């Protein structure tokens, strides 16, 4: 696709209309009786641009034209460009934690605490609601000890997060798919995340509900979301099993899921974290996948 041709205008109406025909039926099946239906604010992770050569500014132009509202994990230097095109930082990093050495490493808490506080300040500065903190690898540690350690450090900073109005969020990952390189993560099942949230006991303690990982480890995507919405501040989507586009080449019905999200009253971002499939155009895929969630 010629980038100038695309940037001159995007014609997504026919696809949106085609998808819209069945939305009222799906909504009726998923809508809780007391929920206020919320429009879905869509964001993206950098993975959706795999194999492309667009500059960051060109990416922002494309996303803005398609109707996206945010970008996950931008650098602080990229924020002015985001805002130039009406996009928001949906989630930021900057806590000192990593997939290897995370919140459960008690010996690193003295390092993590000031970093998390600084990350909260950064989120306030750039206008981002969510700060991600990673639980890390077990390396022989029991899940119980991991939950205790994670809750301990998060409890030390929860007051500051509450004061500043910033969500602290942990992301679930799967431990089954070797190619995803996360086989030893302590937070590989929803129950562990809910447990930590309950221990911390703060309205600012949340999780990133990554539907790709949840489907692999827990399943029951919609019910788990609806039953634990108070602990969810951010959602990631990707096709299962390939982690590619969220269309009908994959096992999850994301149109149905999108209606369930909208009907639940969830008002956070839903971020695309898939990679374009072989031979597929990233921009066309973004357009199509945006339409699937645009309910």
Model-derived regions, located:
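Active-site acidic/histidine proton-transfer and metal-coordination neighborhood
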Residues: 9-19, 34, 101-206, 216
């Amino acid at each position: 696709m010629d980038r100038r041709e695309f940037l001159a205008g995007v014609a997504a109406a026919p696809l949106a209309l085609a998808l819209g025909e069945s939305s009222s039926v799906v909504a009726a099946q998923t809508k809780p009786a007391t929920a206020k239906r919320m429009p879905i604010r869509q964001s993206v992770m950098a993975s959706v641009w795999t194999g492309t050569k667009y500059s960051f500014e060109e990416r922002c132009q494309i996303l803005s034209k398609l109707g996206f509202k945010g970008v996950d994990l931008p650098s602080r230097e990229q924020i002015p460009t985001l805002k130039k095109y009406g996009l928001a930082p949906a989630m930021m990093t900057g806590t000192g934690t990593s997939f290897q050495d995370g919140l459960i490493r008690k010996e690193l808490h003295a390092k993590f605490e000031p970093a998390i506080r600084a990350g909260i300040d950064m989120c306030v500065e750039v206008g981002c609601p969510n700060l991600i903190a990673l639980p890390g690898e077990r390396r022989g540690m029991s899940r119980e000890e991991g939950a205790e350690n994670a809750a301990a450090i998060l409890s030390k900073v929860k007051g500051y997060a509450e004061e500043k109005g910033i969500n602290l969020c942990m992301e679930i990952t799967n431990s089954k798919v070797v190619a995803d390189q996360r086989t030893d993560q302590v937070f590989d099942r929803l129950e562990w995340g809910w447990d930590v949230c309950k221990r911390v006991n703060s309205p600012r303690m949340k999780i990133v509900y990554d539907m790709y990982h949840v489907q692999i480890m827990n399943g029951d995507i919609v019910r788990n979301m609806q039953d634990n919405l108070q602990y969810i501040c951010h959602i990631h989507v990707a096709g299962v099993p390939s982690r590619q586009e969220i269309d009908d080449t994959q096992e999850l019905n994301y149109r149905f899921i999108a209606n369930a999200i909208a009907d639940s009253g969830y008002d956070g971002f839903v971020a695309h974290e898939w990679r374009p499939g072989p031979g597929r155009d990233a921009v066309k895929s973004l357009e199509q996948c945006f339409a699937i969630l645009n309910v």
